[in-house]
Amino acid sequence: MLIFLLKELFRHYIANGSSMYVTMLDASKAFDKVNHSKLFTKLIDRGCPSFIVRILYYWYRTQKFTVRWCCSFSEFFTVSNGVKQGGILSPHLFNVYMDDLSVNLNKLQIGCLYAGTIMNHMMYADDLCVFSPSVAGLRKLTDCCAKYGNMFDITYNAKKSVCMVIDNKPRDKKNIHPVVINNHTLPYTEKCKYLGHIINNNLTDDDDIARQKRCIYAQANALARKFYLCNNSIKTTLFNSYCGSMYTSSLWCHFKKQSLKGITVAYNNSFRIIHNLSPRCSASHMFATNYVKSFNERIRSSIFSLLCRLEKSDYILFVKYLHTFIYYQSPLIKHWIDQLYAFNS
């Protein structure tokens, strides 16, 4: 859903002849650097009941750790930073710790006007993306992130953080003003990965389709090696779980026919690899026999699922988006309608 909103925002600005300057910031081990004292102070300032704060304080202050090396263990030690990896409360505590950064970015009133709301960043856990129609605005947003990181022990890795210009026109990177964070100049790239989805500077989806194709082949070969003795029912279940759930496939709308044909072949071949079938066997027959969805059915199912989630969402930005002309002019929405209501394949 977050990637959908981000790409729709970029498409809207490109369609209106404007560029978009984006920075993907990589926070190095952000969950491990949460300062406990500052976290508890934020909880108190937000009005969290004092007994809950005391429970969390006691829980984090009294926990002890040890390091295992082969059959030996180190002495127990305590830590003063970080939230527990995999803990139920950890994502919520981290959101509280980082929420003031979102507030500070919104106070700048710099960014993009979209569905009646000024937007300049999107954050999911420690994955942060800031954007602005101008380089000057992007530099102010990046400086705000750097200042907050220095105040609350969040270090942004300049080597893994990148900038990108979303535009239909080719641009010379040398003529674009640099973006600096922690005295390091961030490089400009033509594509980057955000939340596992590859975003290209011209918003084409060929690179992300290629990524998914590699994942399908890798999963199929791994399953074929490990579960070659299982029966067909188990193999089909594994195929549906690992090869059938194609991440962000519902967001593909600008791609070459060759790219789509390549991933269709990969999808069909992965089923043959897992079931040890002949490369020449009919794809439609093997899917019908094993009650498995074809590639086009998978795409339509993922589109319908995302569309239902979008219409049922109570998030204010999605509600505004559904009631604006942007929704009806979106190329992605038109592609969805063609896929759901035109049964040519």
Language-model-detected regions and their locations in the chain:
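Charged boundary/loop elements
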Residues: 1-45, 136, 159, 249, ...
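Conserved pre-catalytic core of RNA-dependent polymerases
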Residues: 1-96
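Mobile genetic element proteins and their domesticated derivatives, centered on retroelements
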Residues: 6, 26, 43, 56, ...
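Conserved, non-catalytic sequence blocks in retroelement Pol enzymes and Pol-derived host proteins
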Residues: 12-16, 28-32, 45, 82-91, ...
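Catalytic palm subdomain of template-directed nucleic-acid polymerases
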Residues: 29-46, 121-150, 168, 201-204
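Short, conserved micro-motifs composed of acidic
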Residues: 71, 155-190
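Active-site palm subdomain of RNA-directed nucleic acid polymerases
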Residues: 93-125, 129-131
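Non-catalytic, peripheral interaction segments enriched in hydrophobic/basic residues
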Residues: 125-126, 157-162, 166-168, 191-311
